[in-house]
């Protein structure tokens, strides 16, 4: 942006800078007014409908992403998402690379030994996705060494292992879906909402869902570094406020067409119902 008048150039540059500062994306804009740093959030954006990239690849979307943004709004902070492999989420907290994780992570006692969890914002069970003409009609049909696709490091992988299934491990939930569609896998275990979403969209007319009644209820929760109890408590309050205002229910209705289920009020209560 060059002009023959130096004064005009400086003025134009100042206006441009001001415009960029005020008009950039809501998650990247400066937070000078509040003096609060952006909330750095690690996510593995491959898990439809919880966290995934928009069609143009420029933005993050999904139920959990919406909840994060609502929480950040309660805290008066902007959000900066960082896309990280699922098995790198906890290390990213431990190294202080990020402030919080938001990636369909179940609060478990094992993980709680490494990080802090906020109050849960979602409850679900596991489900199996299999082709419509598959002989699999119950979990019992998958035991005795049956091969199943799972995302490594997840409760689905632990469940399959406990049941004696032969595991085909993948880094991302989206890889499981691609493998099912390509015919390389005859079954995959996902969280039930993800399974239902796939069968209703990309897998429509070709796949079906088999419930896993003996899987325990899983509570999804945001994670924090062990030394960041202050942020954990702030997020706990924000989640409680979102429940009270009805915002969490609105977001749940938006993505799942059902009211938000009743959940434990604290992580400690949730951990009493998980392994």
Where are these regions (language model features)?
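Short, low-complexity disordered leader/linker segments with a strong preference
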Residues: 1-38, 273-275
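Periplasmic-binding protein-like
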Residues: 45, 123-130, 192, 200-237, ...
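Extended ligand-binding regions for polar small-molecule ligands
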Residues: 25, 65-74, 140, 154, ...
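A ligand-binding cleft/hinge motif common to bilobed small-molecule-binding domains
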Residues: 91, 105-113, 159-162, 186-216
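Bilobed "Venus flytrap"/periplasmic-binding protein-like clamshell domains
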Residues: 41, 46-48, 60-73, 125-177, ...
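Extracytoplasmic small-molecule ligand-binding "clamshell" domains
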Residues: 32-104
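Acidic, polar ligand-binding/catalytic clefts
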Residues: 69, 78-141, 208, 214
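Ligand-binding clefts/hinges and TM-proximal coupling segments of bilobed small-molecule sensing domains
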Residues: 26-32, 155-171, 207-209, 239-275
């Amino acid at each position: 942006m060059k002009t023959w008048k130096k004064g005009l150039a400086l003025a134009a540059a100042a206006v441009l800078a001001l415009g960029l500062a005020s008009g950039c994306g809501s998650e990247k804009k400066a937070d000078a007014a509040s003096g609060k740093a952006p909330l750095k959030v690690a996510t593995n954006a491959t898990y439809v409908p919880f966290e995934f990239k928009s069609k143009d690849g420029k933005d993050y979307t999904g139920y959990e992403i919406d909840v994060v943004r609502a929480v950040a709004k309660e805290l008066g902070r902007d959000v900066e998402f960082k896309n990280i492999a699922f098995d790198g989420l906890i290390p990213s907290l431990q190294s202080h690379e990020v402030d919080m994780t938001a990636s369909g992570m179940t609060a478990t006692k094992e993980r709680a030994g490494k990080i802090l969890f906020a109050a849960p914002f979602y409850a679900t069970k596991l489900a199996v996705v299999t082709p419509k003409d598959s002989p699999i009609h119950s979990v019992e049909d998958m035991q005795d060494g049956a091969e199943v696709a799972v995302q490594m490091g997840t409760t689905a992988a632990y469940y399959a292992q406990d049941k004696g299934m032969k595991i085909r491990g993948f880094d991302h939930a989206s890889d499981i879906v691609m493998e099912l569609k390509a015919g390389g896998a005859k079954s995959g275990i996902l969280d039930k909402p993800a399974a239902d979403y796939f069968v209703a969209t990309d897998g429509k007319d070709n796949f079906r869902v088999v419930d896993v009644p003996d899987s325990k209820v899983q509570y999804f929760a945001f994670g924090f570094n062990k030394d960041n109890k202050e942020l954990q408590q702030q997020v706990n309050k924000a989640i409680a406020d979102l429940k009270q205002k009805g915002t969490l229910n609105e977001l749940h209705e938006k993505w799942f067409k059902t009211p938000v289920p009743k959940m434990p009020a604290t992580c400690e209560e949730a951990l009493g119902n998980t392994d």
